[in-house]
Regions:
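Glycine- and acidic
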Residues: 1-3, 19-31, 53, 59-64, ...
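C-terminal, charged and often intrinsically disordered regions of DNA end-processing helicases
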Residues: 1-49
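A structural signal for short, well-ordered beta-strand segments and their strand-loop junctions
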Residues: 6, 129, 167-169
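Short loop/turn segments at secondary-structure transitions that flank enzyme active sites
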Residues: 13, 22, 47, 51, ...
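A non-catalytic, helix-rich entry segment at domain boundaries
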Residues: 44-133, 137-138
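Active-site metal-binding core of divalent-cation-utilizing nuclease and nuclease-like domains
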Residues: 128-161
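Conserved small/polar residues in nucleotide/adenosyl-binding loops
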Residues: 192-199
Length: 199
């Protein structure tokens, strides 16, 4: 989860954002950093799967194959995400991409195709949720008494096949983080194993 990563990276930034509720101001920039790249990819995937599940929750092999052949449709999902997340314009507007933005757009389309090809191997499956916010309160006994905190995050996607619920966490780049200690490997698992992730 992003909040946990923010805490591990910089506790003061975590406090300002998640405890005090302060947000960093939106910057108007032509640049696409890795966080924005990931956000655009996430929204593109969500738009694609929202369309795929418009008539039912089950994703069939034929649906994915048809979408994989439709480059115009895939580009339209990415364009919609760019309009919302980078350009901050209405869906009807047609912003002009600069060279770097155009390259990033094509890379995101290729990532989206790879996601669809990966999911093709898993079909048929049922879409359970996308971009689902989860949180759990945990009470820890300390020397000063019990201390309660809330851990939370957003699950990119949950889908199901037969009796298996799959949690999908999209990764679009960056170098793999090496945990400083063994505890960091298991903390996020607490959220994913809580008793009610599938409302």
């Amino acid at each position: 989860p992003s909040a946990l990563n923010a805490y591990l990276d910089c506790r003061l930034r975590f406090y300002y954002r998640y405890v005090a509720g302060l947000k960093t101001p939106d910057e108007v920039s032509a640049e696409i950093d890795s966080a924005l790249f990931g956000t655009i990819f996430h929204l593109s995937a969500q738009l694609a799967y929202t369309d795929l599940t418009a008539t039912g929750k089950t994703i069939q092999k034929e649906d994915l194959e048809r979408l994989l052949r439709n480059d115009v449709k895939l580009q339209s999902y990415v364009d919609q995400a760019f309009k919302k997340e980078l350009f901050k314009v209405s869906p009807e507007e047609k912003p002009e991409y600069n060279g770097i933005q155009l390259i990033n757009s094509k890379v995101i389309v290729s990532y989206l195709k790879q996601l669809l090809r990966n999911d093709l191997q898993y079909t048929p499956f049922e879409m359970v949720a996308m971009e689902k916010k989860v949180s759990e309160e945990i009470t820890i006994q300390t020397g000063q008494g019990p201390f309660t905190l809330r851990l939370g995050g957003t699950i990119d996607r949950m889908d199901a096949k037969e009796s298996t619920l799959r949690i999908v966490d999209y990764k679009t780049g960056g170098s793999p983080k090496i945990p400083a200690n063994i505890e960091q490997l298991f903390t996020p698992c607490l959220l994913y194993t809580s008793p009610s992730p599938r409302d």
